[in-house]
């Protein structure tokens, strides 16, 4: 059997990822399904779906961390800060909480989940510092429109925004 080449996405830092990721929204809500959900994530990773997406609001980062614990170097781990926590201090604290729950020293891609009340300047400053501290490898946003993206990349440090994750569920 001939091995088929899979498409990949390459981020600005050279990190590559399968364009089809595993979302985890609604996982972790049933203790009875915990083992099954962990195994499903692990199976996806084994098949090459190395992007695993979670968020602080999903309340399942511990489950996601457990699923990827034995293959962390193979996984591109995505998590998101809630807009209500996206002040400078709030972003840094939310990231620390996520790191603890995920059981990892770094998050590969940390996103602002959607537009909120905090100024983008604060969020961008926090994301830039988290990246410099090695707590996140890349940062970006989720669910932003063109005007928001133009605003973000115009800010000091805004050119570090690696992606806008657009909502698309199958």
Give the location of each predicted region.
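N-terminal binding-site loop/beta-alpha segment at the start of enzyme catalytic domains
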Residues: 1-75, 105
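Beta/alpha (TIM)-barrel catalytic core signal, keyed to glycine-rich beta->alpha loops juxtaposed to Asp/Glu
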Residues: 8, 115-170
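Active-site mouth loops of central-metabolism enzymes
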Residues: 23-35, 79-89, 112-113, 118
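Short, acidic/polar
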Residues: 30-44, 87-102, 122-123, 146-151
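Acidic/glycine-enriched edge-of-secondary-structure segments
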Residues: 53-55, 80-86, 136-137
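CE4/NodB-like, metal-dependent polysaccharide N-deacetylase domain
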Residues: 91-111, 129-133, 154-155
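Feature marks short, surface-exposed loop/turn motifs that line or immediately flank catalytic pockets
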Residues: 26-28, 58, 85, 113, ...
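Hydrophobic faces of well-ordered beta-strands that scaffold small-molecule active sites
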Residues: 18-23, 52, 77-79, 107-112, ...
